[in-house]
Amino acid sequence: MYPLTSDIASITSTQNPLVKQLRQLHQTKGRKQQGQLLLEGTHLLEVALAQGKGFNHGCFTAMWQEKNPVLADRLMAQSVHSYLVSGEVLAKMASTVNPDGVVATLTMDQFWRSPPPHARLGLVLERLQDPGNLGTILRTAAATGVEGIWLTADCVDPTSPKVLRSSAGSSLLLPQQQLQSLPPLLEKFHTQGLQLIATVPQATQTLWEIDFQRPTIVIFGSEGQGLSAPVLELTTHQVAIPQAPQVESLNVAIAVGVMLYEARRQQWAASTPG
């Protein structure tokens, strides 16, 4: 636990060095250089606090503190540095157009957690580019009980403010690991006896024919290009998601959701008596 800040500092100038420091966290380069990310808004803060996270900086307006006195006290107790800031300063710190009055910084070592070595349901993502899609996928993964997520380094940055917001905080709940190359990971999964499932439009087998009660890794690629050939070659099953003939394809976040909920349905049915 971080120590309680005895005397909260006040920032009223948008030229304060901390404003520039936190604005740098809007970009991947700044987050990597500082080793921390930016949480914006009450909901993300609540999720982080529920996970026992501690913060380098907690910044909030007087209006936000008045509306959320208990949460403000918890934030100060869990922050190395706490600041009461003006609305103008908060707006400069945040990446959103209309921030709700609070931001906090979280160290990267509290975000990245290695997935368990033997996940019953895991998700692998290659070259995913859209932050909204990734955030939605992470939210769905948390809802369906995914135990671990592996992303290639050329995916959109999961620590970006847009991904964090669109995941509604779910990205803070999931063990995630970033990798330069997928084949070594997939080969390890093979040796563990996991089935590796990818969606391919021309596949003759549908996802409904897969036994998701077996330990499974679901693999999805970029919105435009799908999975690379080396990754596809390492899958154990290639399946199609049935759809009307006039529809070319599903959005990748929707496709992931369909697959994960089918897996969850089968697992739930198997564990329900009768």
Curated annotation (Swiss-Prot):
One of its GO terms (cellular component) is cytoplasm. Its EC number is 2.1.1.-. The keyword Transferase applies. It comes from the Bacteria. InterPro entries: Alpha/beta_knot_MTases, MRM3-like_sub_bind, Ribosomal_eL30-like_sf, rRNA_Methyltransferase, SpoU_MeTrfase, SpoU_subst-bd, tRNA_m1G_MTases_N. Keywords: Methyltransferase, Transferase. One of its GO terms (biological process) is methylation. GO terms for molecular function: RNA binding; RNA methyltransferase activity. Pfam families: MRM3-like_sub_bind, SpoU_methylase. Belongs to the class IV-like SAM-binding methyltransferase superfamily. RNA methyltransferase TrmH family. This is Uncharacterized tRNA/rRNA methyltransferase slr1673. It comes from Synechocystis sp. (strain ATCC 27184 / PCC 6803 / Kazusa). The lineage of its organism: Bacteria, Bacillati, Cyanobacteriota, Cyanophyceae, Synechococcales.
